[in-house]
Amino acid sequence: MKIKTLLLVFAAVMLFNISAEAQSLPRRVRNVEVQDLDAQKARLPWWGEKNLMIFYVDPDVPKQNDEFITHIEETKRLAGPNIEGFGIINLKDSWYPVPDSVIRQIAESRTAKNGATILCDPDHWVSSAWRLGDCNDKFVIMLVTKAGELVYISKGEMSVEEQQRFIEAADKLR
């Protein structure tokens, strides 16, 4: 009985440490190999050249933060010579009963309209390499400096206060 209790306590401590590590910022991250919309290998664009605003999105919840993201895009609130933004579709966490190729086609039709850069992560490559923790059913917004430091992360629906913190953090990188 004592062994089971000790194992449970140990497991809880390990999970807490992993969760805390996943959220500690700033921290170094590396350029990760992902896929383009044609399922070809690709690296994160502008890595080391510009600061990056990355939207890592579970396709099950593409509308989380939609009003805020639309506001940023339409007002060009975070546009600047030192920052670029792009999206990465978190395909692994999608429960959609459609093949990944259909999700890629939907994304491709959207990029044709707005010129956005969208990549795909078919197997948690980004979330694992960067120790992001659970990103299922989350619209994850991140800021990475051109030096490769993850300086901001928000997962899920952002409060007004969190939106303001994001804008303040991004303003420093423009």
Name every feature range the model reports, one short phrase each:
Residues D137-R174:
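Thiol-/selenol-based redox modules, centered on thioredoxin-like
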Residues M1-L8:
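Bacterial N-terminal signal peptides that target proteins for export
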Residues L8-N17:
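Bacterial N-terminal signal peptides
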Residues P62-R110, S127:
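Structural microenvironment flanking redox-active thiols in thiol-disulfide oxidoreductases
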Residues E21-A42, K63-E67, G115:
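N-terminal "domain-start" segment that seeds a small globular fold
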Residues V29-R30, K113-T117, L132-M142:
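Structural micro-motif
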Residues R43-F68:
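Short active-site neighborhood of thiol/selenol oxidoreductases, capturing the structured segment around
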